[in-house]
Regions:
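Charged, heptad-repeat coiled-coil alpha-helices that serve as long linker/dimerization "arms"
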Residues: 1-85
């Protein structure tokens, strides 16, 4: 019974980990674009604002996913401890 309870939690944990990795890659790409000195020219203001907004949104989403992952991981650890003990 505990194994059956554990399975969906592990699946959820894996899904969240995959999403975190995806968001981290997207964030790295945005930050790499923000490192381009040419982006700070007056002609690039619209693009700069867009990238800054995207960066903020990615960070917000990543923070939420990480918090959810921590909760799920605690549940997984708790169920695994019950199963072992």
């Amino acid at each position: 019974e505990l194994r059956q309870k554990l399975s969906p939690w592990r699946k959820k944990q894996g899904t969240l980990e995959a999403r975190m990795e995806q968001l981290q890659q997207q964030l790295a790409t945005v930050e790499q674009n923000l490192a381009d000195p040419g982006l700070y020219d007056d002609q690039q203001k619209v693009r700069l604002k867009g990238l800054l907004a995207e960066q903020a949104e990615l960070k917000r989403e990543l923070e939420g996913i990480e918090a959810e992952w921590l909760e799920v991981s605690e549940t997984v650890e708790s169920l695994e401890a019950e199963l072992a003990g």
